[in-house]
Amino acid sequence: MSQQKRLGILVGGGPAPGINSVIGAATIRAVLEGVEVVGIRDGFEWLSQGHIDYVETLTIDKISRIHFRGGSFIGISRNNPTEHPAHLENTVISLLRLNVSMLITIGGDDTAFSAMKLEEKAAGRIRVVHVPKTIDNDLDLPSHVDTFGFQTARHNGVDIVKNLMVDAKTTSRWYFVVAMGRKAGHLALGIGKAAGATLTLIPEEFQAQRIRLREVVDTLVGAIVKRLSYGRRDGLAVIAEGLVLGIDPSELAALDNVERDAHGHVRIAEVNLGEILKALVAKRLEPFGIKTTIVAKNIGYELRCADPIPVDMEYTRDLGYCAAKYLLSGGNAVMISMQGGHFVPIPFRELLDPQTGRARIRLVDIHSTRYAIARRYMIRLRRDDFEDPHELAKFAATAGLSLDQFRREFDYLIENEPPPLVIDFEKNGLVEARPGREGSPFSEETADAGPPPKGPG
């Protein structure tokens, strides 16, 4: 076997648009510096079993145009070599047998953790860097830095939602669109806000330790009632799939239409959140005499292997170049990032959450101006609705309830509502989400009340 220095590249986790651009950029940089590059097929799958035959030499001719395409040129796998000490040992030994002294891993938080443990186990024999990838956008990067693939996934998700919104209006129905994002609501919120969905629900907005299923259902019901009072029978809610992980398992266990294991426990991963909410919302509307057609739709898999849009192609070219250049310059044990147009290596040790021992997860900041603006454009029951007797009377009449009855049913929904938007002239006119104050040009009473009654979705 040749003793020439070798750089290995592998991809873990789920697909994301832009993977091939990272592979291509890193390969070109390394080859031009005289280093052989091998693509390791199917992530850690074969290495962890001690197999070294599933590799392919990457050349500039092979990869020079793959950046236009989605998917992964060298495959992908969710195999986790850290689950068993022997698998991690096999992975290190397999890489050494392949004469790989430098490794680029491409993946999300789980692959980042595997990269950390692999580098630690290799003890200087293999230098490792990680390129963050996930359409969930939940890796612990600065708030203004996206993970690659997110923008392409959002772009394609918005196209899907746009068409569904037209269908909803045409057919007078509601869509419950469940978007990928098991740990954070970035993708759901990004799609919903950009598309102008009627409302978007993410796990971060429910601040209790456990999400009450009734609160999720009533938020959707309140939106339907409010929308109907404006003369619109249609709407579209974008819902982050991660909500299901926060719902009390005992509430899910009480449902009839969920999959269970041999011991009768609910299979969380198999919960069809859209269908469950569709059934519960329809049932909740019955006492109010409201009938509406609801269609549940999952989107996610059709986003993961989309061809990357130019912003992700350019971004991943930067990441791939920097990953290879950093290793070739003697660097080790960092996650690659681009911040403000500059390469910023983030040491592995800074990625770990001391409480979990795993890579940190970046959640949606529900106290940010971006989120506050998103909330103001949603049609859902708000605090100012309950303070306006005329509006409240319309909603109560639509539900066939008195004002007091409507309050008893729904006013608990506003307990954790973020404060309204204000302009702070003391900070150069920056918009902040905080309670209105005397003398502020925008207080709760004058804040944007959302789209006009007959406005778009």
Where in the sequence are the language-model features?
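N-terminal phosphate-binding or glycine-rich loops at protein starts, especially the Walker A/P-loop
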Residues: S2-H51
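A short, small-residue-rich loop immediately preceding and capping a beta-strand
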Residues: R6-G14, I19, V100-D110, F176-V177
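Short, ordered loop/turn segments at secondary-structure junctions
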Residues: G12-G14, V35, I40-E45, R78-N79, ...
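Short glycine/serine/threonine-rich phosphate/pyrophosphate-binding segments
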Residues: A16-A26, L47-S48, P85-H87, I106-M116, ...
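Accessory alpha-helical/coil subdomains and C-terminal extensions
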Residues: V37, S94, M102-G107, F113-K117, ...
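Glycine-rich oxoanion-binding loops at beta->alpha junctions
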Residues: S48-S101, T111, I135, V145-D159
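C-terminal non-catalytic interaction/assembly regions of soluble proteins
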Residues: L252-E445
